[in-house]
Each structure stands twice: as C-alpha cells, then as structure tokens.
Amino acid sequence: MDYNFVIFGSDGGFYKTAYSDIMELNSVIYRESLWGVNNKITALIYKLYHTSRLPNRHLPFKNLLYRAISDFHFSDNRPVCFLSFGRNIHEKTYPFLFYLKRNYPDAKFAIYYQDLIATHPHTDINWIKQHFDLVLSYDYNDAERYGILYYPTPYSSIPVETGIGTEKDLYFLGATKNRFTEIIEAYESCTQNGLKCDFNLVGVPGKQQVYKDDIHYIKSMPYRENLSRASRSKCLLEILQKNAKGYTPRM
C-alpha cells in the first residue's frame, strides 16, 4: 500500500541537504523537529512542555499543542507513515506518539537512528521496538546488537561549489566523541609524511586542543561548506567512533 509521509527530522544542514530530493514531493511533509513549531502560542506551550520543572501530567493545553502540530494536509487520502529521527523520541514525547496513534489509526510508525543508540541517553530500545512498526539504524553493528534493521545513511543529488582555496591531500571533519586520540595520531602520521591536511574538529575543549595553528577547532560548520572543502581535497578521512560500523556522511 502507498503512503503519504510525515518526517520528523532535524534542522541540521546535513539532514536538510540529504533529504532534499524528497522534500518537494506532494506525498512528503518534512519537519525540522518533532514539533515544527511555527507560531508564538504553540512555541510558548512547547517551551512549557520541555521545562524539567513541569511534569507531563501537569502540562496545561497539551491537547492544544498536539492539535496545532499534527494538522497534516495531503492531496489524497492515502494512509500516513510517520518517520521520526531517533533523537526526537524520548520520555517527554511518548504522549505525542500515542496521540498520533489515536488520531491516525491506519498509520504506520518508523524511527531511524542516525547515530549510535548508546549516544541517546534517554532511549529505551525495547520500548521503541514495541511501539514502532519499523526501527532502523545507520550502523550495521547497532542493527545486529539490538535486533533492528540496518539502513545506510541517505543522500540526495545536489550541486556543489568548490569555492576558492588550496587543494589539500586529506580532509577530516567531525566531533571527536570517543576517538580524539586516534584523530590526532592520524593527523601526526599524515603530516609527518608530507600530506597537506585540512582537519576540522568540533566541540573540543580549549585545554584539550593541540596543533592549534594547523587544526581548525570549531563549534560547527555549515554542511554546504563541508561539501565545498571536501571537493577541494584528494581524499576524505573516516575514523569511526568506538563500537560503530556505519559510515557517516562526510560528503
């Protein structure tokens, strides 16, 4: 059976780029979060909803928020498949999931983890498997570990501007997570062997930063800039975080 799709995604530059091929389809609604808050009233209720001082059961106007953010319109009456990114689903958002299930009884519900499940601190994977029709992971090991389906990171076809800059031999961009030592060792080995490197590390504390004249320590990078830098490099470096086997979207 064919479906219309509601994707509860992310406002991150990569995700909006990776899913751009389907965003303009009449059968797809892409939201940059679970809520897609777009007016002051629902934004205020949303803020109340996420304060740790207010338990779910005491939230005023909860149904008003749910109605405001679940008014989906398609050109036909096909059933809906709701696909959520993993970080959107946690204890605070379970009630909204049940609201959707009550109001869309013919719908299917899928969830896609695009990072290791262990990095989602509030995820009860057994609960997730009980309440979703389809559970996916970008990482092959995670899929095996938790008994869910493996699905590689999606991409869309987009034009890339190379921009202006010196061509590099090797390019790396990423948060260090649990691989800082391996990243620095790779940098040292490559530069000692004469390679021109463009290393960009995200969110590294100042006291931990080394080779600061040559390595770029940043808070974030627009995904289009990442693509531009990658296109000016001969090779991209992938260093998987520990326990991971799924490749990440370097370009």
What feature does the model see in each segment?
Residues L100-L116:
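Active-site proximal beta-strand in glycosyltransferases
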Residues F82-L83, A110:
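Short, conserved beta-strand segments within well-ordered enzyme catalytic domains
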Residues P79-V80, A107:
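Residue-level recognition of the N-termini of beta-strands and the immediately preceding loop/turn
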